Each structure stands twice: as C-alpha cells, then as structure tokens.
C-alpha cells in the first residue's frame, strides 16, 4: 500500500492526540477501555475537523489545475463548508458554498450562528438553497460551479463530505497509518474503531487503511444519515476505489464494511433522546463536546454498545471524534438549560 505517492498539502498540526476517556469508561462499568482520537483538534483553521484531513489531498490537485475558487456544498450547519471556507482563506482563494436545507429543525437563528456564521466571517459566498437532504451529487452545487465559470473564474469542485471526489478517501487511509504508529508508542492495539458515517469517505478510508493489518471489519460505522443503505453503498464504493488508488493488494468485500443503523434517527440532523443523553454525559464526564448531527449519534452508538455488552470485556475502543461542536449554538433551543 502506497499513500506517499499522492501529494499532500499540510493543513493540520500533525498526528492528532489519543485521549483516554477514563471517567466515561468507569461510568459504563470499567470493562471496556474507551479512548478518543481528537480529529476535532487537528488544525488551527477554524476549528478543523475530519474534512481538513481530507482536504490535504484535494488542495494539491486544485492548485495543479489552476483553480481560483473552491466550490462546496452541505447543509446550513455543514462542518464541511466551514472547513472549505477556512482552507480557501488560508490559500488566498475564493470560496462559494451551497447551503441546503438538510435538517428539519426550525430556530430563528439557525442560519445565522455556528458553522455558517464562521464561513461568512471568512469571506465565503454563502448561498442558501431550499433543497432537502440527500446523498450524492446535487444540481445546486453544479449550478454554483457554472456561475463561477460564467463570471470568468475557475472553480474546483469539492462535493459533500469530499466523498464523491476521487481522492476523498485518502485522508483516512492516512488516519489508519497514523493510529498504527501511535499504537506502537502506546504498546497496544485497538480492538475497535468507532466512527460516524453519512457521506461515506471517512469510514471508507479507514476500512482501506485498517484492511492493511486485517482490521477492516473492526471499524464500526455508526450511521447518522437515517438513509443507511445509501450510506453503506457509498462507503463500499469509495473504499473499493480508494483501495485501488493506494494499491491495497486485495479487494474490499461487503463484510469489510460494518455499519450500525440503530442510531441515525429520528432523521438526519435531529437527535434522539439517547443522542442527547450521550452528548450531555460525554460533556459532563470528560469535558468533550459532541454535536446532535454527527458525533452525538456516534457517541450514543458507542455508549449503547458498551452497555449492551457488544464489545468483549477488556476491549480497547477508539472513538474517532470528527468535529462538529461549532454547530452546537444552532441548537440553542435544545441546550438552553445545558
């Protein structure tokens, strides 16, 4: 497997820290050791997050093409678009962001605080669109790229989650390689890695990266899309493409992709009572903030799996914290009392 042949533009601080979650582990009975790998602390660019790791492999391609405008898409409170806006500002490029109405949540300030506020502060051209949530290529995004061309610019397309981009899975192949190096320092291997999945390239990259040492099916995706079959198809397709890119040396098969579908409801972007409990529990025991859209759902999944005995006693479980806390202010009605 050869990731090094792909150019990478440094946007992160380096390897992200692995933090033991001692109080949460003890609260859940102490039979399973929980750790978090803090992708939410990976960069000085507008709080970073998992998309910043992915963008390190897209930026060289954008620069090689002579692009002057990064064009991306997400929901109103998209973490992806905030990270793209930050990278554009860092590079001195223009940025156009399509923000669709992906979440059926009404709050007077929902489109004025959190991620979208930060994107505007960084100079992005933010375009609100009424279209609802789905996975895949969106017409509104294609129209935004055409508008840049019509104005004489040269757009560089960055799809939702970087996931439909041919290089979108590479960053999290690197995540797996990074974890292996950290395991050598720690003196043990993780038995499971828990990660939130929606558009698929984060888990897909991990599946490929951990397939190199036989742990592909130990990557436990927690679906947050509430459209799990679409998400599963994307993860599998992206993983197969990425495996070919890096020369994994074996095919990705269906059993490599593990996606737990119990925690995505009630729908994309709306938290269940279990998700809200997980968000508050993690915050109050560890001072670690998770959000109602993504990380709260994957945290809910991990906590529930520990409680249900789905991790063997003595297991060491690594929670991939992908970011998302900047969206919390958009849900102030839910968290007004903490």
From Swiss-Prot:
Keywords: Hydrolase, Pyridoxal phosphate. GO terms for molecular function: 1-aminocyclopropane-1-carboxylate deaminase activity; D-cysteine desulfhydrase activity; pyridoxal phosphate binding. Its cofactor is pyridoxal 5'-phosphate. The keyword Hydrolase applies. The keyword ATP-binding does not apply. It comes from the Bacteria. The active site is at 78 (nucleophile). Gene3D superfamilies: 3.40.50.1100. The modification N6-(pyridoxal phosphate)lysine is found at residue 51. Its EC number is 3.5.99.7. GO terms for biological process: 1-aminocyclopropane-1-carboxylate metabolic process; amine catabolic process. It catalyses: 1-aminocyclopropane-1-carboxylate + H2O = 2-oxobutanoate + NH4(+). Pfam families: PALP. CDD domains: ACCD. It is an enzyme of class 3 (hydrolase). Homotrimer. Catalyzes a cyclopropane ring-opening reaction, the irreversible conversion of 1-aminocyclopropane-1-carboxylate (ACC) to ammonia and alpha-ketobutyrate. Allows growth on ACC as a nitrogen source. Belongs to the ACC deaminase/D-cysteine desulfhydrase family. This is 1-aminocyclopropane-1-carboxylate deaminase. It comes from Burkholderia cenocepacia (strain ATCC BAA-245 / DSM 16553 / LMG 16656 / NCTC 13227 / J2315 / CF5610). The lineage of its organism: Bacteria, Pseudomonadati, Pseudomonadota, Betaproteobacteria, Burkholderiales.
